[in-house]
Amino acid sequence: MSQNEIKSYELEKHTTKDIHDSHINGSLIPIWRDWDKIITVQPEMVYVTTINPGEIKGPHLHIIRHSYYVCIKGRVVFIIKDESGKYIEIESSEEKPVLIEIPKNRSSAHINLSNEPSIILALVNPSWKPDNRDEHDVTYD
């Protein structure tokens, strides 16, 4: 597969259990494992970003940054413009986690569909730097 393709991967979600009485005490979601071979561009930075309820981040374009995103709290729709100009909508949430790969030179907007702040885990290459943000604002029709 090309590093220029927009891709998404449904992630596994496993319940975790208490050691004393086996009640469910949480969950575990593998984002990446070495044998999955879904991360084709090695991340140089991992960070957490938030989106307030009903808010939109973007749309903006990263010219040099290749990004992977997964919503780990709340519910977010990612709207990505592909190379033909078509809009692709991919939803990721804490209930149904989806890892979304957005190559450089593809614009995207991230919309919080939740009533509370949503939290997104981001894996990017190259690293974000305050003096070289690589965020170029664009507009969607």
PLM regions: where:
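Non-catalytic, conserved peripheral segments adjacent to functional cores
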Residues: 1-99, 115-141
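Asparagine-centered strand-capping/turn motif at beta-strand->loop junctions
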Residues: 110-113
